[in-house]
């Protein structure tokens, strides 16, 4: 009997989802959901993991669980095709995390590139919450509990999945072939790996105030688009513009397709060809 093809993916409910999430993961989840290539798709809202750096504000996490669920539905994730669940409602995941802790050393967690980056971003370098530090172990529990064969992630999360694979191999070595070792599914479009903020900074972030949220109204979206960073040296219409570092063109790459430019000559078959026209 062929092994079931199972996807598991999710988000920490630390805030409303924005178009960076859509480009980076949500759009692809919908495509995978509708592809018919997978037997089961599990998408979870990782509220327990969100508490690891939001313990002082559980109400924020609780409210964001609802916001993320609404964003999922708005993007096209279909509960009749994908199983959407809340992490904290499955206590066995915490139990499995506890047992997996015996298979991982502190030094190995410290070497995880994703963990090191996240610690620096959150200024945890002198005092790290244990729950946050062991986040990769919790993620391994999520993946293996549902016997996921495929985990779609961005390149920045690849070390986390590799850590899960290490845990699986060690567990199976000790206890026999029990757990499924997941495969990593990376984005196939380089332009969609990470969408910059509207101010041109490398990352779209709520704390930086440079997000366009999926739940923004039409007026809010229009206001944010009109204020986007473009080319500060392009002062007059007749001045030549620069494409490099121009956030607008990055967004066009992410959201537009050649068919969106039907009014332009048919010889322009790729979005990049339209940049000279625009």
What kind of region is each of these model predictions?
Residues 73, 77, 105-108, 145, ...:
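Hydrophobic/aromatic-lined pockets within catalytic cores
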Residues 17, 55-66, 70-73, 83-90, ...:
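Conserved phosphate-binding loops in nucleotide/dinucleotide-binding enzymes
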Residues 124-167, 171:
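Internal, conserved structured core segments that host functional sites
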Residues 265-268:
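Short, compositionally biased segments
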Residues 270-278:
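Single conserved hydrophobic/aromatic residue that forms the stacking wall/gate
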Residues 2-141:
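N-terminal Rossmann-like or analogous alpha/beta NTP/dinucleotide-binding catalytic cores
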Residues 172-202, 206-207:
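Feature 926 captures the class I aminoacyl-tRNA synthetase adenylation module centered on the KMSKS loop
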């Amino acid at each position: 009997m062929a092994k079931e093809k199972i996807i598991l993916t999710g988000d920490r409910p630390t805030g409303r989802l924005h178009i960076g999430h859509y480009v980076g993961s949500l759009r692809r989840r919908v495509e995978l959901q509708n592809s018919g290539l997978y037997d089961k798709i599990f998408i979870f809202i990782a509220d327990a993991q969100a508490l690891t750096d939001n313990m002082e504000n559980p109400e924020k996490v609780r409210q964001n669980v609802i916001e993320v669920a609404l964003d999922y539905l708005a993007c096209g994730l279909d509960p009749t095709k994908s199983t959407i669940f809340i992490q904290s409602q499955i206590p066995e995941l915490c139990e499995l995390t506890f047992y997996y802790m015996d298979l991982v050393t502190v030094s190995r967690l410290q070497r995880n590139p994703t963990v090191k980056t996240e610690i620096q971003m959150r200024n945890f370098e002198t005092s790290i919450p244990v729950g946050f530090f062991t986040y990769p172990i919790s993620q391994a529990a999520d993946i293996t509990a549902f016997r996921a064969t495929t985990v779609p992630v961005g390149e920045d999360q690849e070390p986390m999945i590799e850590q899960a694979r290490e845990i699986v191999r060690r567990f199976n070595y000790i206890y026999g072939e029990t757990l499924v070792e997941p495969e990593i599914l990376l984005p196939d479009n380089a332009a969609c790996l990470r969408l910059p903020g509207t101010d041109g900074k490398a990352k779209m972030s709520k704390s930086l105030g440079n997000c366009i949220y999926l739940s923004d109204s039409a007026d809010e979206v229009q206001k944010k688009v009109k204020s986007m960073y473009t080319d500060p040296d392009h002062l007059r219409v007749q001045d030549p513009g620069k494409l490099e570092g121009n956030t607008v063109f990055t967004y066009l790459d992410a959201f537009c397709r050649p068919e969106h430019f039907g009014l332009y000559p048919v010889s322009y078959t790729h979005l990049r060809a339209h940049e000279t026209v625009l």
